[in-house]
């Protein structure tokens, strides 16, 4: 397959490098177009009011294009200008940190995969729960990368449906210690925001965002629940934000006309 590979942690991130190596190892042609800098939390944003620039990075075991922009910029530029033809698959990741439940709205990793899905391309977002307290920061991600590539190869993409993203999350442990893969819905639980206030040397306040998803609000069998229990999770995502139940209710209110 011809695979477009991107992420939101930047072109030098070890998760992307692991997926690159695993894809090449499996015999695929890989086109890397990824942000030059950290872009976590930018969601599906894109650059509008300034030009998008890029630079080619060539290393002994790696070749890619670094984009001074968002993950969505990377996918749009790759498909619209840089790639010689449409890829067979777009993979985004491996992200440092899980993307489950409400995370998907903020995630640049999922944002890039969504952009590809909007272009009718098979699309997969891959994340590793690296922010868990018991996860070694230097953990080798090649086993997860190989597993994700194998999933992409085995996936019946025609049965997945149009404009869908396959969202994969790996638990905070070595792959051989993970529980089995579960296909599951995302949790509807939301983050409880906590901002830590500090002062700069001039006495002006600034804030760091922290917080958590309250455990009691996480539905059993959801992506967050299963990931917390050590399972690999697979959740199909679609991005029709229309509330169809609400649509029917509003039509009954006779507001039109």
Curated annotation (Swiss-Prot):
Keywords: Cytoplasm, Hydrolase, Metal-binding, Nucleotide-binding
Cofactor(s) recorded in Swiss-Prot or TrEMBL: a divalent metal cation
Binding site for a divalent metal cation: 8-9, 40, 95
Catalysed reactions, semicolon-separated: a ribonucleoside 5'-phosphate + H2O = a ribonucleoside + phosphate
Listed InterPro entries: SurE, SurE-like_Pase/nucleotidase, SurE-like_sf
Protein's cellular compartments: Cytoplasm
Record carries keyword rRNA-binding: no
GO molecular function, one term: nucleotide binding
Gene3D superfamilies named in the record: Survival protein SurE-like phosphatase/nucleotidase (3.40.1210.10)
Cofactor annotation remark: Binds 1 divalent metal cation per subunit.
Cell division is among the record's keywords: no
Enzyme nomenclature, EC number: 3.1.3.5
Main localisation: cytoplasm
CC terms in the record's Gene Ontology section: cytoplasm
Enzyme class: hydrolase
PANTHER family according to UniProt: 5'-NUCLEOTIDASE SURE (PTHR30457), PHOSPHATASE, PUTATIVE (AFU_ORTHOLOGUE AFUA_4G01070)-RELATED (PTHR30457:SF0)
Protein family membership: Belongs to the SurE nucleotidase family.
NCBIfam families: PRK00346.1-4, surE
Physiological role: Nucleotidase that shows phosphatase activity on nucleoside 5'-monophosphates.
Protein name stated in the entry: 5'-nucleotidase SurE
